[in-house]
Structure formats: structure tokens, C-alpha cells
Amino acid sequence: MISPRIMFTRRSAPYWATFLVIVLAALWLLWIGREPICTCGSVKLWHGETMSSESSQHIADWYTPSHVIHGLVFYAALWLVAPRLSFGWRLAIATLVESAWEIVENSDAIIERYRAVTISLDYYGDSVLNSVSDILAMVLGFVLAARLPVWASVAIVIGFEALTTWLIRDGLALNVLMLLWPLEAVRGWQAAL
């Protein structure tokens, strides 16, 4: 049997904190009324249809790369502003920020904002499964950024943005643009897909 003193060490504390943040985010999302899984009753590893009521309801979709990008960007930002913090604590902070975003993104105000200014007319918020998967995609991006050379991280960001812009006419940059400063020309271009 593993001793609790071995499992809960000073070195493992940030990873337990990261895990706890993810669990608390999932519980909060359930508490505010988010569906645990897609109301269609199934769980898919991949759902590639963006103009669908099942979008943002399954494990991965075309918006998953945006969350990987979050991880890459959070790693770079925390490396710059908190270089003395351990990798584990920087990961915990990044997970807290990503979890906070998932909670805000799934608030009624933001859901209505998406529906009002973007082409996401069928968007009713993420399932809890999708939100947790998005957080884990951010963790993946964070770990990749720690292991890869800077040029590779930059290439991933550019590649994912180019890929999603080309295939679904959306991505992290366009999503932020349309949420904060909606442009009718962009909305029309996205709707023409």
C-alpha cells in the first residue's frame, strides 16, 4: 500500500492542485446546470460538425486545437512573468485560468453573446465532458510547450490557426475577434461555408 505521505509531497502538491481545480470546475459546471454529456445520449471521441447542436458536447471537436493553443500561450506567459515558479505550479495556475474561462464561457451571458454575434446559432454551452476535455487539451499544450523548442510551439499555433480557419472558418483568433469586436464581414464569410 502506498503511504499517503508519499502521495502527498511538496513536489506533488501542484499536480494535486491542478487535479482539484479540474474537479471543482466540473462540479461548478454541473451545479450551474451544464449537461454532463451530450443530450443526444452518446459520447463521441470526435465530433467534426460545427453547425450542429452536438458541437462542443463531445470529447474533441474543431475547437480543441484552440485549447491546445491556450496551453502553449499560458506556458510562454508564465515562463515570462513567473520564471522561478516550478513547472507544476505554473501548470496549476494555467489550469485555474483555463477552468475560469470554461466557467465564464458557459455562463448565460457569454452563451447569449456567442449566439448574438457569431454564426454559432445552435450553441447552448459546452457539456461538462467537453469542458473538462478542453481543460485537458490546454494541459497538453502546456506540456508540449515545456518540451518543444520555441519554434515548434510557434509552428503549432500558426498551423492550428491556419487549419481551423481554412476548414471551419473559425479558430482562436477569429473567436476572440467575434466575441469582443464582431464584424459583419467576418460573420458573413463564416456563414458562407
Swiss-Prot record:
Membrane topology reported for the UniProt record: Multi-pass membrane protein
Keyword Membrane tagged: yes
Source superkingdom: Bacteria
InterPro entries per record: DUF2585 (IPR019691)
Keywords assigned: Cell membrane, Membrane, Transmembrane, Transmembrane helix
Pfam families referenced in this protein's UniProt entry, alphabetically: DUF2585
Location within or outside the cell: Cell membrane
Assigned GO CC terms: plasma membrane
Major place of residence: membrane
Claim: Ribosomal protein is one of the keywords in the record: no
Annotated transmembrane regions: 13-33, 62-82, 148-168, 172-192
Family that this chain belongs to: Belongs to the UPF0314 family.
Designated name of the protein: UPF0314 protein Pden_1914
